[in-house]
Amino acid sequence: VTSYTCMDLFSQETLLRNAEKALLDLVNNTADLDLLTIVGCPLVSGSQLINAAVAFQRGEILGVVPKSYLPSYKEFQEERWFTASSHLQQSMITIGNREVPLDCYLIFEYDEVRVGIEICEDLWVPIPPSSELAMQGANLIFNLSASNELIGKHAYLRSLICQQSARCIAGYVYASAGFG
């Protein structure tokens, strides 16, 4: 809903309030579609800000998946703004007037598909959340990303995605704001 480039604007209440409003508009405007939709959005859980993926269908938010691994090297400073899933104090989050599950290991069922979600950096760690999601029965993993562009990174990323898909015995859908 917002952009990864918001950086210090993530601490602005106006940005967070309007991001949640835009998210609720998306949920409401797709209520007549039988489509599982996943969008990224910064959300406040208690007093903690999370980089999250929100899954919704037919006007209902099904759950929120917080990012597990926050990079804090080179140009990445996510720990400055966000809280990692392992440090969250709640397992539910209120969006608008709806209380929904909040967990990095949620699985969403859509027809015959069991969908798991991870966010960008989560794929790059030794044991990604998608590995656990696959062990719990997910057969399709979505990764929401806003990865930067570096020479040679695309080939490495493509290889990483193919390897993780094979390890999980699952389809792996990688959607980035950049190339690919």
Predicted stretch roles:
Residues V1-G180:
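Enzyme catalytic cores with a strong preference for nitrogen-chemistry domains
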